[in-house]
Curated annotation (Swiss-Prot):
Biological process according to GO: translation
Name used for this protein in its record: Large ribosomal subunit protein uL5
Molecular function as annotated in GO: rRNA binding; structural constituent of ribosome; tRNA binding
A Pfam family the protein falls into: Ribosomal_L5
The keyword rRNA-binding appears for this protein: yes
Family to which the UniProt record says this protein belongs: Belongs to the universal ribosomal protein uL5 family.
Task performed by this protein: This is one of the proteins that bind and probably mediate the attachment of the 5S RNA into the large ribosomal subunit, where it forms part of the central protuberance. In the 70S ribosome it contacts protein S13 of the 30S subunit (bridge B1b), connecting the 2 subunits; this bridge is implicated in subunit movement. Contacts the P site tRNA; the 5S rRNA and some of its associated proteins might help stabilize positioning of ribosome-bound tRNAs.
NCBIfam families, A to Z: PRK00010.1 (NF000585)
PROSITE patterns in the cross-refs: RIBOSOMAL_L5
Amino acid sequence: MAARLRERYEKEIRSELMKELGFANPMQAPKLEKIVVNMGLGEAINNGKIIDASVEQLSAITGQKPVVTKARKSIANFKLRQGQSIGAMVTLRGDRMYEFFDRLVSIALPRVRDFKGVSPKAFDGKGNYTLGVREQIIFPEINYDKVEKIKGMNITVVTTARNDEEGRALLRHLGMPFRQ
């Protein structure tokens, strides 16, 4: 069964975007390409167990096993060696991506303390949107009692939009709560 948000995009949102942006061909309408969830774990240099806990939490949040990112080069000031594990990331595509985006905008973001909406300025000039989450406990899949340390993550939504206006229109139609 296809993701609920994907079906809504194909049935309603794509045609609304075509009218709004003045496209004739449905393939011109912007769509989600992938979502990258990255958790940088600088403190993993001193404590290797943090990586395992974070990998477990990221896989619970995204439904996919994360890849452990390693340091590209040694930095003496940070006590960092080349090849040392310093983070975890997941790239979501297809139905998992739509399901994650749906959970993010409808369940997780409203659980952020003092949430007034996400910044409409965090686009990169090519229609992609990046947002930082300060706590992983906003996701319902995370058991608050088992969390040792509260960690944040970066969520990048990559779209096929050609510019920020198209990307903003797409995310607004998909339900992203932008600040006014």
